[in-house]
Amino acid sequence: MIQVTLIQIDNYGPWTVTPGPRAEPDLQTLQSRLYGDLEREFGAHGAIVFFNRFDNLIAISNGMDYDDHLLIQQSIRNRYPITISMGVGTADTAYEAQKIATKMIQNGGGAQSANRCEVLNIDSLADDDNSLVQIAHIDINDITNTLTDIETAFDTSIKVYEVLLALMDELAKIGGMCFFIGGDNYMAPTNGISKDQLREALKVVDKKTGVTLKAGIGVAKQAGRAADLADIGLEDIRAELVDDSVLLFNDLDEY
């Protein structure tokens, strides 16, 4: 089971314009700092946070319980002018788990509700016996020579985000999610998706976007370790140690 935590800034839209519109550089700084702090605090528990939309962040939080989440909420309250609410859900696939986590937050009130503050609603937690995280680290083949060094920076970004949208769409169809993590890199929680299914999804995106993708996959009890294994797999593909576009490393013998 994969455990997903949705993190949402409380009443953020109204706060940004109260008592008047706040300076945009200050808001961007707040969002980036908040993401960095959440990544560090969740990461201390072996989890990973994806910035998603910055005011709505998604964490793969296997191994974390109610108290772990509560302490992070309190830490943010003590250091920021805003508060955060969280919803937690588990499921066989990442897409289904985030649906449950979203419902948990929505049950506590709307995103712009002045009455919602530090909601922490947990549908279920993945225990050690059934905790499993599968993460794919995906990148574009030779982006330096095909895009970065020959196209403008903005045109390269258009292509990178075109690939992201195609990956999000294809992986969601089979129960996965996908997030941009910088450069030409994407990270995808892919519980329940086989190597063959992922390989086929990458081929579909290749055809749609005109790039060539490859992916390392990691399987472990927690997201941090799964991502590390995925990184190793991707590095082996880059080094041409294997003749495949997808390589999986697994910490769990029973998987």
UniProtKB/Swiss-Prot annotation:
InterPro entries: GTP_CycHdrlase_3, Nucleotide_cyclase, Rev_trsase/Diguanyl_cyclase
Signal peptide: none
Keyword Ligase: no
EC number from the UniProt entry: 3.5.4.29
Catalytic activity entry: GTP + 3 H2O = 2-amino-5-formylamino-6-(5-phospho-D-ribosylamino)pyrimidin-4(3H)-one + 2 phosphate + 2 H(+)
HAMAP family linked: GTP_cyclohydro_3
Keyword Hydrolase: yes
Alphabetical UniProt keywords: GTP-binding, Hydrolase, Nucleotide-binding
GO terms for biological process, alphabetical: biosynthetic process
Recorded family membership: Belongs to the archaeal-type GTP cyclohydrolase family.
Leading EC class: hydrolase
Protein name according to UniProt: GTP cyclohydrolase III
GO function term, MF aspect, one: GTP binding
PANTHER family: GTP CYCLOHYDROLASE III
